[in-house]
Swiss-Prot record:
Phosphoserine found at: 334, 338, 343
Protein name as annotated: Rhodopsin
Glycosylated residues in this chain: 2, 15
Keyword Repressor applies: no
Protein's membrane topology: Multi-pass membrane protein
UniProt family annotation: Belongs to the G-protein coupled receptor 1 family. Opsin subfamily.
Listed SMART domains: 7TM_GPCR_Srsx
GO biological process: absorption of visible light; G protein-coupled opsin signaling pathway; G protein-coupled receptor signaling pathway; visual perception
Residues annotated with N6-(retinylidene)lysine modification: 296
CDD domains the UniProt entry points to: 7tmA_MWS_opsin
Length: 348
């Protein structure tokens, strides 16, 4: 083994020289230079400074403007709630641990940080699944006369949290575990060992199949069908130009969210899968640190995409920030006119 395993941790560094210490008790500066830990702290500070206000603003603006409380927006706002949990309960923890060079909050803090990071990522993934299915049903119309309503949205939100918790809760109760990873300043699922005491192997297989491969397969299937249907409808002019334009723009926004998710999370999932399938292989702490910390940027991109590509929300946000007046003078009537009856979302 090219790493050192101990109670509730696995350090990717051989202890032949005797320098390895518990990541819960002492700084891990033998893994990387102190300035690298400072860079991690600065990065986490940036995510907190950007992530909290933009996600909070997304929720606040929606509460202030009733017209934004539409069924499909419930799913999008659900992402903001999950991101806020990640920022408040996860990122603040990682900021402090990075400043100290080790996980100062102990095993309980590691469990909390790992839980919220995993939950946030899984809520985002399953929300994208719900959005993909909604787009498929609305655009492809496999069920005639179906309208995505408030009850469907509430069920979709509940579904995302049930599936996310089905992934993040088991390690708390002994099916796998949360341990520090990379430079030992953030926590995640134990991909590093096959510890039979925690049944790591079965959980990692379950996680990759049920909570990564299956949802991505559903997403790709839905959008594959959707692209084909949109092209066919455009060729046959089956719907009005306004409806087609609105549906295409809503779909484009969701597809961009999927691409952003893949950019953020596929590197982490790929590295985790490599480590799991190459037990005992030689890899450094930075090998897992970079994708793990890069994945945390997912807390920012969803609201940014939503704000940039949703004109109605953009106007409402400007109105809220400017104390009830929109200095740009955009006509809300032109915005709401572009809404579709099926999705109730007004894209840019």
């Amino acid at each position: 083994m090219n790493g050192t395993e101990g109670p509730n941790f696995y350090v990717p560094y051989s202890n032949k020289s005797g320098v390895v210490r518990s990541p819960y008790e002492e700084p891990q500066y033998y893994l990387a230079e102190p300035w690298m830990f400072s860079c991690l702290a600065a990065y986490m500070f940036m995510l907190i400074v950007l992530g909290f206000p933009i996600n909070f603003l997304t929720l606040y603006v929606t509460i202030q403007h009733k017209k934004l409380r539409t069924p499909l927006n419930y799913i999008l706002l659900n992402l903001a709630v999950a991101d806020l949990f990640m920022v408040i309960c996860g990122f603040t923890t990682t900021l402090v641990t990075s400043l100290n060079g080790y996980f100062v909050f102990g095993t309980t803090g590691c469990l909390v940080e790992g839980f919220f990071a995993t939950t946030g990522g899984e809520v985002a993934l399953w929300a994208l699944v719900v959005l993909a299915i909604e787009r498929y049903i609305v655009v492809c119309k496999p069920m005639s006369n179906f309208r995505f309503g408030e009850n469907h949205a509430i069920m979709g939100v509940a579904f995302t949290w049930i599936m996310a918790l089905a992934c993040s809760v088991p390690p708390i109760f002994g099916w796998s575990r949360y341990i520090p990873e990379g430079m030992q300043c953030s926590c995640g699922i134990d991909y590093y060992t096959l510890n039979p005491e925690f049944n790591n192997e079965s959980f990692v297989i379950y996680m990759f199949v049920v909570h990564f491969i299956i949802p991505l397969t559903v997403i790709f299937f839905c959008y594959g069908q959707l692209v084909f249907t949109v092209k066919e409808a455009a060729a046959q002019q089956q719907e009005s130009a306004t409806t087609q334009k609105a549906e295409k723009e809503v779909t484009r926004m969701v597809i961009i969210m999927v691409i952003a998710f893949l950019i953020c999370w596929v590197p982490y999932a790929s590295v985790a899968f490599y480590i799991f399938t190459h037990q005992g292989s030689d890899f450094g702490p930075i090998f897992m640190t970079l994708p793990a910390f890069f994945a945390k940027s997912s807390s920012i991109y969803n609201p940014v995409i939503y704000i940039m590509m949703n004109k109605q929300f953009r106007n409402c946000m400007i109105t809220t920030l400017c104390c009830g007046k929109n200095p740009l003078g955009d006509d809300e009537a032109s915005t709401t006119a572009s809404k579709t009856e099926t999705s109730q979302v007004a894209p840019a």
